[in-house]
């Protein structure tokens, strides 16, 4: 994974949310608040299932 954007599915409520691959802060699900991404100093640790990579326009 590089520093792109990913559509990640929340493991608790199945909400699909776009997350930056190198997030520097924790990213929570907008619906239920479950952590979807945790920063690691480089690429974020994506905790939900990656549905797809968002392509650049």
Curated annotation (Swiss-Prot):
It holds the Pfam family Ribosomal_S27e. GO terms for biological process: translation. Its cofactor is Zn(2+). A zinc finger (C4-type) spans 10-32. The keyword Ribosomal protein applies. One of its GO terms (molecular function) is zinc ion binding. Keywords: Metal-binding, Ribonucleoprotein, Ribosomal protein, Zinc, Zinc-finger. Binds 1 zinc ion per subunit. The keyword NADP does not apply. This is Small ribosomal subunit protein eS27. It comes from Halobacterium salinarum (strain ATCC 700922 / JCM 11081 / NRC-1) (Halobacterium halobium).
């Amino acid at each position: 994974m590089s520093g792109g954007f990913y559509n990640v599915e929340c493991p608790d409520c199945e909400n699909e949310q776009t997350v930056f691959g190198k997030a520097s802060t924790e990213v929570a699900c907008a619906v239920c608040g479950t952590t979807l991404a945790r920063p690691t100093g480089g690429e974020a640790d994506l905790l939900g299932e990656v549905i797809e990579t968002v392509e650049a326009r």
